Amino acid sequence: MSEEMNDQMQVRRQKLQELIDLGIDPFGHRFNRSSTSSELKEQWDQFSKEELHEKEDESHVSIAGRLMTKRGKGKAGFAHIQDLKGQIQIYVRKDQVGDDQFNIWKMADLGDIIGVEGVMFKTNTGEISVKAKSFTLLSKSLRPLPDKFHGLQDIEQRYRQRYLDLITNEDSTQTFINRSKIIQEMRNYLNKQGFLEVETPMMHQIAGGAAARPFVTHHNALDATLYMRIAIELHLKRLIVGGLEKVYEIGRVFRNEGVSTRHNPEFTMIELYEAYADYHDIMDLTENMVRHIAQEVFGSAKVQYNDEEIDLESSWKRLHIVDAVKEVTGVDFYNVNSDEEAIRLAKEHDIEITENMKYGHILNEFFEQKVEETLIQPTFIYGHPIEISPLAKKNPNDERFTDRFELFIVGREHANAFTELNDPIDQRQRFEAQLVEKEQGNDEAHDMDEDYIEALEYGMPPTGGLGIGIDRLVMLLTDSPSIRDVLLFPYMRQK
């Protein structure tokens, strides 16, 4: 802590004690406010200075917020207070509020939470303001706010002390308001489509539903190892078996992996499943839902991201993964007939691969290393190889591939979906193949889930499923470069 900061805090604590000595509670209780700052402006800014003077008797208001500016000496002063909706100016005069309250006003510091009752007026410059009739200290701020002209310059401090970021950065506050609206519109859209929102466990006995490393925990009373969920998928598909034909869940998912501008150890996903649908139906649903959200929240289906206009309004491109790789690299994996040939092609095109990778893994590496970052406008990539899609249904025309798609926008994956595998015999074989991969060192391979296979053995209808990372979608729609910009409290390394 700097010496200047320490001095300011000492002065504030001295003021705190002075208030207590005067019998004033520096940390107040309830305050009855009539309006927010934006409501006052909307209601009263339409009137002229003279009209407001005539309406003074009917313009009595009460407002509360954080003291952001303060100026004036002697027997009067101006200030701006800030609430969630913005800022409004207040005017405090000694002959209006009385000696005792004006003394409290003089001791007020930037950052204090205050309540004001008064009437509306306009200054000579035309600024709508509240003329205080009474002034109440609601919470004494013992630490000074960041400098009003420079704010929080340290990006890491913004993430670690999000409350300061929200106080001083209007854009940051708006991002999180928009995040809430995005999720709300997602719910509205799905509910109108007849989907049922459900809740499923976050602690699993088996980590499944995605290729990811789980967080491991322990249940003391049961002496059992549990895994924080890496996906919502398998429980929702059990509900499809049970006859809940259209279900979704929005919730936290946990993956024990690296931290980056796109990854946080815990993040928010939506997964949904629709009986009697396939991945083509889910493509349509995804496109229509994202377009609807953008239109409802932002008023346009065309959004800006990193100086690029992203067109969510026009029909989205749909491209088989093999064709996407061929367009960029010239390699046609339809004509690759062995793992050995795929390995040779990887070496020729400088594709990094690891031991034990097969045809499908190598095709996926071609895509991720050469193609993915080129997909700026919304593009559905479909037909992923079976080796990397253990829960997706085989394509009936070419069993090397599955009826699966991923959505890419601005070079990033935003959704993953497929026609769900509902054959319990095939599913068991896929899990067994995953166990072999795990023995060979792939710690993201699936475990065997006997309970899930048993559920499939009772019969699951043809089903389309979808997963969307909500954080990445919010990044896209709010033009935020890092996932930390859209998480109120992102994971940060300990100091």
From Swiss-Prot:
It is found in: Cytoplasm. It catalyses: tRNA(Lys) + L-lysine + ATP = L-lysyl-tRNA(Lys) + AMP + diphosphate. Binds 3 Mg(2+) ions per subunit. PROSITE patterns: AA_TRNA_LIGASE_II. Mg(2+) 2 binds at residue 413. The keyword Transferase does not apply. GO terms for biological process: lysyl-tRNA aminoacylation. One of its GO terms (molecular function) is tRNA binding. InterPro entries: Aa-tRNA-synt_II (IPR004364), aa-tRNA-synth_II (IPR006195), aa-tRNA-synth_II/BPL/LPL (IPR045864), Lys-tRNA-ligase_II (IPR002313), Lys-tRNA-ligase_II_bac/euk (IPR034762), Lys-tRNA-ligase_II_N (IPR044136), Lys-tRNA-synth_II_C (IPR018149), NA-bd_OB-fold (IPR012340). Mg(2+) 1 binds at residues 406, 413. Its cofactor is Mg(2+). Its EC number is 6.1.1.6. Belongs to the class-II aminoacyl-tRNA synthetase family. This is Lysine--tRNA ligase. The gene is lysS.
